[in-house]
Amino acid sequence: MSEIADKVKKIVVEHLGVEESKVTPEASFIDDLGADSLDTVELVMAFEEAFSVEIPEDAAEKIATVKDAIDYIEKQKAA
């Protein structure tokens, strides 16, 4: 697992209070991890701060799973 993936996983565990084992790439923040819309906004803000990236609202709406977040951040960091 990449450094970005590890950090995303840690942020999700801290913000949603879920077990680390439940935070898989395919896990949906809302359906699998019990997040609500406010939680997802807070996660996006945490990702922006932790990785020094900007995630516009239209992109944030498409980030539904752990893998979506990792992929988006990796693309931004590579740009």
Swiss-Prot record:
Cellular component per GO, a single term: membrane
Molecular function, one GO term: acyl carrier activity
Alphabetized Gene3D superfamilies for the sequence: ACP-like
Predominant location category: cytoplasm
Annotated compartments: Cytoplasm
O-(pantetheine 4'-phosphoryl)serine modifications at: 37
One Pfam entry name: PP-binding
Function: Carrier of the growing fatty acid chain in fatty acid biosynthesis.
Swiss-Prot/TrEMBL keywords: Cytoplasm, Fatty acid biosynthesis, Fatty acid metabolism, Lipid biosynthesis, Lipid metabolism, Phosphopantetheine, Phosphoprotein
Protein name: Acyl carrier protein
Carrier domain sequence ranges: 2-77
GO process terms (BP): lipid A biosynthetic process
Pathway: Lipid metabolism; fatty acid biosynthesis
Record carries keyword Ribonucleoprotein: no
Family classification: Belongs to the acyl carrier protein (ACP) family.
Post-translational modification: 4'-phosphopantetheine is transferred from CoA to a specific serine of apo-ACP by AcpS. This modification is essential for activity because fatty acids are bound in thioester linkage to the sulfhydryl of the prosthetic group.
